Amino acid sequence: MKISEYTKEMMDENSFIDLAYMALSEKGKEVNLYELIDEFKAIGNYSDEEVETRVVQFYTDLNTDGRFLSTGEYMWGLRDWYSVDDIEEKIAPTVQKFDILDEEDEDSPKIALLGEDEVEDELDLLPSDGDEENVDTEDEEVEDELDEAGLVVEPDEEFEDEEDEFDDEEEEE
């Protein structure tokens, strides 16, 4: 019996993944995922809400069931149709090729090396000596509130010693 001859009851008895296997076996060619779902919706007279509840599981099953193979964007076929070499070609990741730069290219202002912009942006964020723009205003507000309340915060000497060591290490670099 062809899937197009199924009744609503027969559609309800089967999972979408089993129906997809039957549909792909009948067609003998890869099919778009959305076409499959639309076909199931039409045959089973499903509402949009009914389809939505089943589609999530269906898509998960398609990806985990070894009988199916994604052959492109939203295209699915049966793994049995393809040789091992074909499968490797279909699912092999695309490798991007880059030109190798020599020292002259690296000095060119037209070429930005990977990560170069990020480093410059990070350097802009670092406070420099006498740079009042980078003072954290939130810290100033907290200090003002403490002064107004008459609270005295004593510095943690151990913390300051560690901070001094950290500053010394940064200067050495």
Curated annotation (Swiss-Prot):
Gene Ontology biological process terms, A to Z: DNA-templated transcription; regulation of DNA-templated transcription
Ranges annotated as biased composition (Acidic residues): 115-173
Matches recorded under Gene3D superfamilies: RNA polymerase, subunit delta, N-terminal domain (1.10.10.1250)
Cellular component annotations (GO), alphabetically ordered: DNA-directed RNA polymerase complex
The keyword Nucleotidyltransferase is annotated on this UniProt entry: yes
Residue span(s) of domain HTH HARE-type: 14-81
Domain of life per record: Bacteria
HAMAP family tied to this protein: RNApol_bact_RpoE (MF_00357)
Family classification: Belongs to the RpoE family.
Name of the protein described by the UniProt record: Probable DNA-directed RNA polymerase subunit delta
Organism of provenance: Macrococcus caseolyticus (strain JCSC5402) (Macrococcoides caseolyticum)
The organism's taxonomic lineage, starting at the top: Bacteria, Bacillati, Bacillota, Bacilli, Bacillales
